[in-house]
From Swiss-Prot:
This is DNA-directed RNA polymerase subunit gamma. One of its GO terms (biological process) is DNA-templated transcription. InterPro entries: DNA-dir_RpoC_beta_prime, RNA_pol_Rpb1_1, RNA_pol_Rpb1_clamp_domain. Belongs to the RNA polymerase beta' chain family. RpoC1 subfamily. Its cofactor is Zn(2+). It comes from Prochlorothrix hollandica. It catalyses: RNA(n) + a ribonucleoside 5'-triphosphate = RNA(n+1) + diphosphate.
Length: 203
């Protein structure tokens, strides 16, 4: 995990530890040499230095090794949003246009309709509709409760967390058996994505 915003030390010109160019995370800056210089040369290949924690290997590993940054708030990865097909819109079974409206803070989305008679989960609301709903909820004579509305990547995260992928996969298989034509093709596409997520065990 990258925990510091530093890149290179201006005096030593070496990458800062735990920074954006960290050798412990991404690999050595020089071939077959650890950060502190205890191990140099090919004969120490594969050794992890006990002082600095850097693996003695080729510097080219830095081109493909990846670290991660813990963000203060959720963000939507553009590959899963804009890629073809858009995995987020397929998983949520929502049109890509609607998903983009939520991500770019143009529309609110209903996360939980509570006991509201007209709201549905995943229904989009404009800012005016959202404010109107807020007024209804906080009115003195209101009986509305349990209603949740969100916007941005945080709302998408919540919708994705609420998915029951195994149950969805079973339901999709049943629907595919009776569906035909374009609808069947769409269901198969969604089932493929759901099955892939279930197979990774990351749900």
């Amino acid at each position: 995990e990258v925990t510091k915003p530093e890149t290179i030390n201006y005096r030593t010109l070496k990458p800062e530890m735990d920074g954006l160019f960290c050798e412990r995370i991404f690999g050595p800056a020089k071939d077959w040499e650890c950060h502190c210089g205890k191990y140099k040369r090919v004969r120490h290949r594969g050794i992890v230095c006990e002082r600095c924690g850097v693996e003695v290997t080729e510097s080219r590993v830095r081109r493909h090794r990846m670290g991660y940054i813990k963000l203060a708030a959720p963000v939507t990865h553009v590959w899963y949003l804009k890629g073809i097909p858009s995995y987020i819109s397929i998983l949520l079974d929502m049109p890509l246009r609607d998903v983009e409206q939520i991500v770019y803070f143009n529309s609110y989305v209903v996360l939980d309709p509570g006991n509201h008679p007209e709201l549905q989960t995943k229904q989009l609301l404009t800012e005016d509709q959202s404010m109107e709903l807020e007024d209804q909820i906080y009115a003195e004579d209101s009986t509305l409760e349990g209603i949740e509305v969100g916007i941005g990547a945080e709302a998408l995260e919540r919708l994705l967390q609420d998915l029951e992928l195994e149950q969805d996969a079973e339901r999709l298989r049943e629907e595919i058996n009776s569906a035909k034509g374009q609808k069947r093709a769409k269901l198969i596409k969604r089932l493929r994505v759901v099955d892939n997520f279930v197979a990774t065990g990351s749900h």
